[in-house]
Curated annotation (Swiss-Prot):
The modification Phosphothreonine is found at residues 356, 375. The record marks 354-355 as: Cleavage. It is found in: Cell membrane; Cytoplasm, Perinuclear region. This is XK-related protein 8. Changing residue 309 to F: Does not affect ability to promote phosphatidylserine exposure. It comes from Mus musculus. It is a multi-pass membrane protein. Interacts with BSG and NPTN; which act as chaperones to localize XKR8 at the cell membrane. The modification Phosphoserine is found at residue 361. Changing residue 35 to A: Does not affect ability to promote phosphatidylserine exposure. Pfam families: XK-related. Residues 1-8, 69-158, 222-223, 280-284, 335-401 are cytoplasmic. GO terms for cellular component: perinuclear region of cytoplasm; plasma membrane. Activated upon caspase cleavage to generate the XK-related protein 8, processed form. Does not act prior the onset of apoptosis.
Length: 401
């Protein structure tokens, strides 16, 4: 097997293994936190963690099942029967099965001297779905739970060891999910080269530094006004949902699924930027950044005016504002640096070893298998590359949604 193909296959296996370990680690950490809260008599905190965990799991399995049923039956001929897959999703094990199946696909190709184009393309197809589901899971479950834990810490004035573990792992996990999703989208467009190490590091850092202050601002407001944070969330969520509806998204195979997607995207936009439609993205990204920044400033200012520079728990609000502001502007600077100098937006035509996937060369024959979901998102994210990318209509003709 050529070295480049072997590296591609090995990467799929590693991604599948990391996804499985991350899923299990998050589950163990959540259940550990629930047990600790119950032992401390904090039943409301334990219930909130379980509610967040449950609703995220249900939505994740629902997305996974809708995508499976939308795909042609012959595409997943190596998977389990449809009734058994339905049972796995009902038991909340659909995402875990996807990770295991993706890793199995990669391992099976490791024993082939020269994997076929179809096998390599199918491995990419599975990896793209896993990356999208992991991103959804990060914002449906990890981000709200991280906000809850930070609010608890701010209320109590101290953090237990399991809380510090959850906070650090959640911040890193969410930022990694954003990076992995961004990298996976580039495999859908022939004119987009893959991210290098320096570009990946800067992309990871600016997402971490911009997301952190936003979550901390919401957590601060939640700690000070625990009965009003739900009203704040639903108010902004409705505004963001209306904004998404105006953009006319077309991601899911039917209208009901599309509204589920819009509801989920509105939740993600409450915390971070996510491009949901085609066209030039810079204007929408700037509008969203100003909107979220203004809202975060309003949340912090309200907490400051009502409680002064010290929270009832004894934590210095001035210290939190200083650190959060520094992180935000550093993250904003890194974001500008990334898109000005490190964003690989040029078109290139590399020499490829025979038998490799050939995703980046516009002169190679079209792939036999396309992930239409990821291709649509990639065309939205990389608007300039859409003209050189595989057209959505051509993807549909290939029979893969």
């Amino acid at each position: 097997m050529p070295l480049s193909v072997h590296h591609h296959v090995a990467l799929d296996v590693v991604v599948g293994l990391v996804s499985i370990l991350s899923f299990l680690l998050d589950l163990v950490a959540d259940l550990w936190a629930v047990v600790q809260y119950v032992l401390l008599g904090r039943y409301l905190w334990a219930a909130l963690v379980l509610v967040l965990l449950g609703q995220a799991s249900v939505l994740l399995q629902l997305f996974s099942w809708l995508w499976l049923t939308a795909d042609p039956t012959e595409l997943h001929h190596s998977q389990l029967s449809r009734p058994f897959l339905a049972l796995l999703h009902l038991l909340q094990l659909g995402y875990l099965y996807r990770c295991l199946h993706g890793m199995h696909q990669g391992l099976s190709m490791c024993y082939q001297e020269m994997p076929s184009e179809c096998d390599l393309a199918y491995a990419d197809f599975l990896s793209l779905d896993i990356s999208m589901l992991k991103l959804f899971e990060s914002f449906l479950e990890a981000t709200p739970q991280l906000t809850l834990v930070l609010a608890i810490v701010l209320q109590n004035g101290q953090a237990e060891y399991y809380q510090w573990f959850g906070i650090s792992s959640s911040f890193l996990g969410i930022s990694w999910a954003l990076l992995d999703y961004h990298r996976s989208l580039r495999t859908c467009l022939p004119s987009k080269p893959r991210l290098g190490r320096s570009s990946s590091a800067i992309y990871f850092l600016w997402n971490l530094l911009l997301l952190g202050p936003r979550i901390c601002a919401i957590a601060l407001f939640s700690a000070v006004f625990p009965y009003y944070v739900a009203l704040h969330f639903f108010s902004l969520w409705l505004v963001l949902l209306f904004w998404i509806w105006l953009q006319g998204t077309n991601f899911m195979p039917d209208s009901k699924g599309e509204w589920l997607y819009r509801v989920t995207m509105a939740l993600i936009l409450y915390f971070s930027w996510f491009n949901v439609s085609g066209g030039r993205t810079r204007g929408r990204a700037v509008i969203h950044l100003i909107f979220i920044f203004s809202d975060s400033v309003l949340l912090v200012t309200t907490s400051w005016v009502t409680h002064g520079t010290w929270l009832p728990s004894g934590i210095s609000l001035l210290m939190w504002v200083t650190i959060g502001g520094a992180c935000f502007f550093l993250g904003l600077a890194l974001r500008v640096i990334y898109y000005l100098w490190l964003h690989p937006s040029c078109s290139w035509d590399p020499d490829l070893v025979d038998g490799t996937l050939g995703l980046l060369s516009p002169h190679r024959p079209p792939k036999l298998i396309y992930n239409r979901r990821a291709t649509l998102l990639a065309e939205n994210f990389f608007a300039k590359a859409k003209a050189r990318a595989v057209l959505t209509e051509e993807v549909q003709l290939n029979g893969v949604l």
